[in-house]
Amino acid sequence: NIAWRDQGQVANLRQSIIKQKKLEYHMRLHENWELFSDALQAASQSVEDGGLDIKSIFIEKDYWISRSLSLMAAKDKDNRAIFKGGTSLTKAYGIGSRFSEDIDIAISEAWTLSGNQLKMLIKRTAKSMTEGLQEMDMPGFTSKGSHYHKAYYSYPRAIDTLQVGAIKAGQLLVEINSFANPYPFQKCKLQSFLTEFLQKTGNENLIKEYDMQPFEVNVLDRRRTLTEKLVSLLRCSLADN
């Protein structure tokens, strides 16, 4: 009986470890490269053909942006990392149809942390967000300090298109700063275009298998973001040419 109970405890522990590891996975469709590539192409088709009518370069970039945000939210136990900027308006609030390659993050209540604590928090946040990505060597652009982090990261491309307009394939810009308190903010449910496509086509099994479920992220209130955008436009209009 003792041996049986010990074996049962071992089995339970093993299942617990597997479950914990499972919870650490976030958006793994790219691990099945052929399926990932096929999904990108299918999702880019017209609505009449069952797709989303969005260019594959945007769908792919959105996948990696969404994955970075999902990873960030999972590790942000103290609710310090707040998603903001123009990309947040589109992804969280459905305002506009802007496609971007930047992920703008602000650290809330930074003044409650020591300089070293803040520096380590920004470093950890950047590391969490960019898991599986490669930092790009861009002298003169990359900027890191105790209050900020700004760098480009590359992701593996599954499509041939290199650029559409100002959007370049294969790269993301991650910006994290603690200069302004991001308030008010709220929890918003986000999902990738690919998740939307899989839902639309009845592929819930793939969403579950590859951890493509919607997730929650702290997002700066849209009124604050829109106000900041308006102020920025006014400053630009008043500036000397």
Regions found by a protein language model. Give the residues of each.
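N-terminal regions immediately upstream of nucleotidyltransferase
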Residues: 4-6, 10-67, 116
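Catalytic cores of NTP-dependent nucleotidyl/adenyl transfer enzymes across multiple folds
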Residues: 13, 20-26, 52, 66-70, ...
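Short, compositionally biased low-complexity segments
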Residues: 29-45, 95-106, 200-202
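Short, histidine-centered active-site or binding-site loop motifs used for metal coordination
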Residues: 44-47, 107-111, 234
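Generic non-transmembrane alpha-helical segments
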Residues: 68-77, 124-132
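Active-site nucleotide-donor binding segment shared across nucleotidyl transfer reactions
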Residues: 73-103, 107-109
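Short, conserved acidic/polar surface loops in the N-terminal third of protein domains
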Residues: 92-96, 115-120, 185-187
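Metal-dependent nucleotidyltransferase catalytic core
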Residues: 107-144
